[in-house]
A protein has these predicted regions:
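Membrane-embedded alpha-helical bundles that constitute the cytochrome b-like, heme-associated redox core
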Residues: 1-230
Length: 230
């Protein structure tokens, strides 16, 4: 039974993870490609907002290991984990480890800032976010600056995340990528009471519709809608 596995990461969470990562990379690429790709950059922004809403709701209503309560710990618990993090023989975490949980929150906050400021930004020539008319020119300029600079922090956070994956794979012999593909971890690591019984797909569908509805509402209530808005 050494090959037996138990479900830890639900399908909606896994789909979120990989679509979210794709949106971040694609947003960077379309921004660098410039004018001809800006409309796609904006569509990616809409998608990202929807994904953020989904993840926050899923953090309260999703299965066990998707919930914030399962991986947000007191500072003392985080410090205890950090102290033993460089031990090759440390027991792998079932869900997000305490440091990984902090990374989840950091990425949500950084990308929320990025997507939120994008709604107000302008290139002062052609393109402007749908909520740009709601703020003054100076405020729009400030938010555009934040939008541009904040992505540097996102890149740094992504780099740290990738470095952690490599560290766990090479130093601690823990593969964090494969379980995020199929959702399972060895039964020797995951007690039966810690595993999830299903991915709660019907609930995920409802949450997805709420997230999509929020994005629709947000754009429908923008002060001005034109062909060149975010």
């Amino acid at each position: 039974m050494s090959d037996a596995k138990r479900l830890v990461w639900d399908l909606p969470l896994r789909l979120f993870h990989w679509i979210f990562a794709t949106c971040i990379v694609a947003s960077y690429v379309t921004a660098k490609l410039g004018f001809d790709w800006m409309q796609w950059h904006f569509y990616l922004g809409y998608t990202t907002i929807g994904l953020l809403v989904f993840r926050v709701l899923w953090g309260f209503f999703g299965p066990r290991h998707a919930r914030f309560s399962s991986f947000l710990h007191k500072p003392s618990a985080i410090w205890l984990y950090v102290r033993g993090m460089f031990s090759r023989n440390s027991t792998p975490s079932i869900g997000h480890n305490p440091v990984g949980g902090l990374m989840v929150i950091l990425m949500i906050v950084l990308v929320a800032i990025q997507a939120g400021t994008g709604l107000f930004t302008t290139d002062a020539v052609v393109w402007a976010g749908p909520y740009n008319p709601a703020v003054s020119e100076s405020t729009a300029g400030l938010l555009s600056t934040v939008h541009n600079w904040n992505f540097n922090f996102i890149i740094a956070a992504v780099g740290l995340h990738v470095a952690a994956i490599v560290f766990y794979a090479l130093y601690k012999n823990q593969n964090l990528v494969v379980p995020m593909l199929h959702g399972h971890k060895p039964a020797t690591l995951v007690p039966e009471h810690e595993a999830i019984s299903s991915s709660q797909l019907l609930k995920a569908l409802v949450v997805s519709l709420v997230a999509a509805g929020f994005v629709y509402w947000l754009l429908a209530h923008a002060p001005v809608v034109s062909d060149n808005t975010y």
